[in-house]
A protein has these predicted regions:
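A short, N-terminal "cap"/entry segment at the start of jelly-roll beta-barrel domains
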Residues: 1-39, 137-170
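Short acidic-glycine-tyrosine-enriched beta hairpin
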Residues: 11-13, 78-96
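Conserved hydrophobic/aromatic beta-strand scaffold that supports enzyme active sites
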Residues: 29, 42-46, 64, 80, ...
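Short histidine-centered beta-strand/loop micro-motifs
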Residues: 31-32, 52-59, 100-101
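Ligand-binding loop in jelly-roll beta-barrel domains
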Residues: 36, 73, 93-122
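A hydrophobic, small-residue-rich beta->alpha segment in the mid-to-C-terminal subdomain
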Residues: 107, 119-139
């Protein structure tokens, strides 16, 4: 990845981005490393009520959330942050965090700087058949959807490395 190359301007509508189902979430890829020359990625997520992400740490990426619709509680170093439509939450790299969805659903924008984590998502989900939440009975993917292994993704995009921690403090 050559970050000295200049990215090109682009526009993508959330009805056009590549969509994936996994972990009960609809993931819409709005910007990936290829689009931004590795600078950042941006994903729109539709998430149902309940625990959304267990405690984890992104060692090499900053992460932000902008709540478009609904309500969520983020746990940053175990401290709760209530977020509603219009809220922006910033998580510095190396910070333990988790979150849960308090409303029926949440629609949010999730950004990673630098890019890379989106490939972990694409490798562990399946292409969505509709722009809706996945069916509750959907089985876990049997194989990676990416041509890269997890190790290759982390090697190519160090920002994809995530440490998942035990326990849910929320």
């Amino acid at each position: 990845m050559n970050l000295q190359n200049k990215s090109q301007a682009f526009e993508v509508n959330n009805t056009e981005g590549r969509v994936y189902w996994g972990m009960g979430i609809l993931w819409t890829m709005l910007a990936t490393a290829e689009d931004t020359n590795g600078a950042y990625s941006c994903i729109e997520e539709l998430i149902p009520q309940g625990p959304a992400a267990p405690p984890h740490i992104h060692e090499a990426a900053e992460e932000t959330f902008y709540i478009l619709e609904g309500e969520a509680t983020f746990f940053v170093e175990d401290q709760p942050i209530k977020a509603t439509a219009g809220s922006f939450v910033s998580i510095p790299r190396g910070t333990k965090h988790a979150f849960q969805i308090d409303s029926e659903t949440v629609r949010l924008l999730n950004t990673y700087v630098p890019a890379g984590f989106e490939y972990m998502i694409m490798a562990t989900t399946v292409p969505a058949e509709a722009r809706t939440l996945p069916p509750a009975s959907m089985p876990l993917p049997e194989r990676e959807q990416s041509n890269l292994t997890m190790e290759q993704i982390i090697q190519k995009y160090p920002a994809a490395k995530t440490n998942f921690l035990r326990g849910y403090e929320g």
